[in-house]
């Protein structure tokens, strides 16, 4: 006798040469549906992984993930909340001298952000590729390095001078002057090919303190860089830094990230609906099978086969479709990802030619396969349970 008997009978029910064409078509469609769902989930999840990594690398690496400051954005260094260093997600912290300003050239005017730097906080701008010219930002010379796109907008070149203007926190009662301004010399440009090229100006830290009327023991705040900025827990950090103000990267780029998350959830919803259709096909197959195999089930029961083993026949029968579909879908998705020319061609039909970042994470593939298989197994329980509710004496009495 074939053992295990439940597996042998289930596979015979799944596919044999005597199956009607209608059943074969439904079985094939169910396998195709689950294959498409699995392949789509793996491909889309991999693209989302790549997009998030690209977002983190090209955008979040050029802005601080957190800024700790106070209401006036001018705070003593000794007020630094040292408890924040205990958090595991902290990668780097440095003090910050920064101010939003107006920058004026002979030809144009624009808004910008000035940042004071020296060797102690060079890490914050290591992506700017200006280490070789950093030494030229000597204190007292009032030299600056500006983004190429900002220079293009202002129509200025190396050696030209810019007037930097900012709103002072204090107002002179007699003169009424509330703006402070100073002329700086451009000694170089930086180009990151990112958004910061349009608005950032770098200057020596001591010069920035003098320009902004800060004492040496004062800073604008502290820049915090996280190991994983996408898993930021703002509430936890707010408790530690209270009563100081906490500005996180979501205030600047949060809308873009929210849009990405909404798109991800919508895609998963559509794919879940595709999976639901495939699972309903499996339920239909099982229901038809239990009706057709009533006599066979009754005979197996009279022969002493346990109800749990009869249920197992139908569970294996239904879940086999999911397992085959998962294997095919995984192989198809990995083939398309590895040989991504077809995938890029297909995407570029709907979107202008662009580079699609793809990152495959093995545990996600495993999770997708397990989840789909579990959904399928759960969908087989009710038809399998109904199959063993039939009384053999009643069914066989008509034979």
Curated annotation (Swiss-Prot):
Name recorded for this polypeptide: Lipoprotein-releasing system transmembrane protein LolC
Gene name of this polypeptide: lolC
Job of this protein: Part of an ATP-dependent transport system responsible for the release of lipoproteins targeted to the outer membrane from the inner membrane. Such a release is dependent of the sorting-signal (absence of an Asp at position 2 of the mature lipoprotein) and of LolA.
An annotated GO BP: lipoprotein localization to outer membrane
Highest taxon in the source lineage: Bacteria
Organism: Buchnera aphidicola subsp. Acyrthosiphon pisum (strain APS) (Acyrthosiphon pisum symbiotic bacterium)
Keyword field: Cell membrane, Membrane, Transmembrane, Transmembrane helix, Transport
InterPro entries for the chain: ABC3_permease_C, Lipoprotein-release_system, LolCE_TM, MacB_PCD
Coiled coil: none
Entry GO CC: plasma membrane protein complex
Ranges that cross the membrane: 25-45, 266-286, 312-332, 358-378
Membrane topology: Multi-pass membrane protein
Compartments it resides in: Cell membrane
Family: Belongs to the ABC-4 integral membrane protein family. LolC/E subfamily.
